[in-house]
Amino acid sequence: MNHAFSFMLAAALLAPATTLAQDTTTSAQVKRGEYLVTTGLCHDCHTPLIQGPDGPAPDMKRALSGHPQEIVVKAPAIVPEPWTGAMSPTLTTWSGPWGVSFTANLTPDPETGVLRDFTEQQFIQTMRTGRHQGQGRRILPPMPWPWIGKMTDDDLKAVFAYLRQIPAVKNKVPDPIPPK
């Protein structure tokens, strides 16, 4: 057997093992991210609710796609004292002293997903600082970034890895509406 063939055969046999180890690590990280997104209640706000036979239920066809673009909100809700906030029936729009906030599209849609331009590090910084991409506009209530930001780097990386591989949903979420 010539040496070039032996080298190519050895390389071919070793490559799948390396890829398999990387795939296993990535798969474990994505599974951890799915667990954290699910138990961290991300779907409660980022997955619109629809009315079903048993009342409101998550619309998993639009999982983590944020406020539905077809539901137009033009102004903050007028909330009587002593209340300080209101929410839409989909749980994707919140109104309070900060104005109106819309839950973001966390899917990897290349046109409308909010994380489309984020690096892993920017995602971590966003969760730590409460600022878009770690330095932009403030993330508005009710996003619990102060608590999510206490996750470990590994957990935040797992959440990011999971969000990068979920089905993309084209859904243009509106910009926040400032208070009056």
Predicted features by range, described:
Residues 33, 39-49, 159, 163:
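The canonical Cys-X-X-Cys-His
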Residues 117-133, 145-174:
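C-terminal capping alpha-helices of c-type cytochrome domains
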Residues 62-122, 146-156:
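Electron-transfer interface patches adjacent to heme c in soluble/periplasmic c-type cytochromes
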Residues 1-5:
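Positively charged n-region of N-terminal signal peptides that target proteins for export
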Residues 19-38, 50-56, 111-112:
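Electrostatic cytochrome c docking/interface patches
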Residues 38, 102, 139:
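Residues that flank catalytic or metal-binding motifs in active/ligand-binding sites
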Residues 6-16:
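Bacterial N-terminal signal peptides
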Residues 43-72:
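N-terminal, post-signal-peptide region of Sec/Tat-exported proteins
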